[in-house]
Amino acid sequence: KQCDYMFANPPFGVEWKNQENFVKNEYKSGFNGRFGAGLPRINDGSLLFLQTMISKMQDPAKEENKGRGSRIAVVFNGSPLFTGDAGSGESNIRRWIIENDWLEAVIALPDQMFYNTGIYTYIWLVSNQKAENRKGKVQLIDATSHYQKMAKSLGNKRNELSEAHIEDITKLYSNF
């Protein structure tokens, strides 16, 4: 099944040890499977989740899709951006995404936006139908100062985006 749009907030730092045999068998399928670009460390399945989403993108080159591709917005912690040395599974997955020119933007959000954790999070925008002015580029948006304090904390969630903050971030993205 292919999708036009996908939105996700997978759990942060979830290990995939219980699915290890299945994942490694799928990896052996190469790019005919979902995990051909590589396998991340076993203690964080975020990039497996993203590879699964990428495998569900419509191919704009296929006649039946009439030039339509797909767009993905996914919220991650910093792990998919920063972990893994050169040549590691994480590094190979990121390289595969960038070499295919699918990563459109990364938006750094304020900390303390989630109930169970105060960590910084990032929205990755992924597309296989980039606008001409975005081809070969990745937009980095620092939205870490775009927040307001909540009247009452909810666990570790102390900050929130107002409508004005969302508009500002959207303008930064749109005016690229």
Question: Which residues does each PLM region occupy?
Answer:
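A conserved structural/catalytic subdomain of Rossmann-like adenosyl-cofactor enzymes
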Residues: 2-176
